[in-house]
């Protein structure tokens, strides 16, 4: 979690605490709140990434799922783990979705544009840097 939060500081100006750690206020809730889901992405026995879902909208709509966090650790990128994991998560969680990415994060932009293309997402630019893709995947 810390490495992911550190990496996200390239896109978001989060501050470290005195011990050099970043805090993710809802982390524990992904393991205790029934509305939230955490997925650990493995290749065999090797942890290669994680994803976190919740039902809270970025655009004041009422999604069934929002991709709150998603990462493949840097050493495992460009090996199709992200595409495969995203497809599995989407196919296992049918409904109305929102996925947000930072326009500066070209890897995320490319991934989510590709993965959501079959669902013809509606694109919302919520500010100069952030885009939300809204779609349904009932089929």
Please describe what each predicted stretch is.
Residues 72, 78-91, 110, 114:
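Conserved acetyl-CoA-binding loop-helix of GNAT-fold acetyltransferases
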Residues 98-113, 117, 125-128, 138:
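Conserved beta-strand-loop-alpha-helix junction that forms the acyl-donor binding cleft
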Residues 56-67, 77:
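A conserved beta-turn-beta hairpin within the catalytic core of GNAT-like acetyltransferases
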Residues 1-22:
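Short amphipathic alpha-helix that is part of the acyltransferase structural core
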Residues 67-78, 101-103:
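A short, internal acetyl-CoA/4′-phosphopantetheine-binding micro-motif in the GNAT/acyltransferase core
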Residues 90-100:
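Short glycine-rich, basic-tinged beta-strand/loop micro-motifs
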Residues 15-38:
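Active-site rim helix/loop that mediates acceptor-substrate recognition in acyltransferases
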Residues 38-40, 46-55, 66, 71:
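Conserved beta-strand in the GNAT
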């Amino acid at each position: 979690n810390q490495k992911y939060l550190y990496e996200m500081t390239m896109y978001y100006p989060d501050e470290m605490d005195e011990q050099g750690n970043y805090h993710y206020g809802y982390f524990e809730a992904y393991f205790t709140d029934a509305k939230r889901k955490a997925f650990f992405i493995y290749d065999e026995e090797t942890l290669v990434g994680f994803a976190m879902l919740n039902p809270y909208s970025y655009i004041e709509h009422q999604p069934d799922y929002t991709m709150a966090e998603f990462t493949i650790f840097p050493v495992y990128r460009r090996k199709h783990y992200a595409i495969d994991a995203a497809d599995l998560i989407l196919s296992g969680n049918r409904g109305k979705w929102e996925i947000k990415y930072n326009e500066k994060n070209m890897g995320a932009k490319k991934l989510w544009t590709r993965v959501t293309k079959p669902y013809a997402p509606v694109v919302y630019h919520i500010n100069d840097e952030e885009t939300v893709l809204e779609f349904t995947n009932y089929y």
